[in-house]
Amino acid sequence: MKLTMGVHVLLYSSDADADRAFLAKVLDLKSVDVGGGWLIFGLPPAEMAVHPTDAGAPPASGPGMIGAHVYLMCDDVQATIAALAKKGVECGPVHTERWGLRTALPLPSGSALGLYQPTHPTALGMV
């Protein structure tokens, strides 16, 4: 069993409509409409790097960079939590949201990644 099936990135924006148009028209990203004007964009394969933080450094550097929440996606959150528990990882409680089931996946540093089982259409495989 794969522990994750993809990555879901949330970008916060003061002008979501403009950013959605940019993603669609400028970056040519395909999307799935999950209702209410919410678009989820397909992304190419991803990679992740771990960067150390310096005391007092902002969480993101560069003009306009305000950070992001990263969620690893899975097909079955309970089965994934059980598989992680066998590896010594204790996830937080599962919360039911209108968009899926979510929990926190703790990292050794004390930070955490989101882990969720989507209940909405996904944009995976649209690239």
Features from the language model and the residues they span:
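Short beta->alpha connector loops
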Residues: 55, 76, 96-98
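Residues that act as N-cap/strand-start positions at coil-to-secondary-structure junctions
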Residues: 25, 35, 66, 97-99
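Conserved active-site alpha-helix within GNAT-family acetyltransferase domains
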Residues: 17-26, 103, 112
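N-terminal beta-strand motif that seeds the catalytic metal site of vicinal oxygen chelate
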Residues: 1-20, 47, 68-70, 119-127
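Vicinal oxygen chelate
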Residues: 1-2, 5-14, 39-42, 59-127
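Short secondary-structure junctions
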Residues: 27-33, 89-94
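Conserved short beta-strand elements that form part of the metal-binding/catalytic scaffold
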Residues: 29-65, 106, 112-119
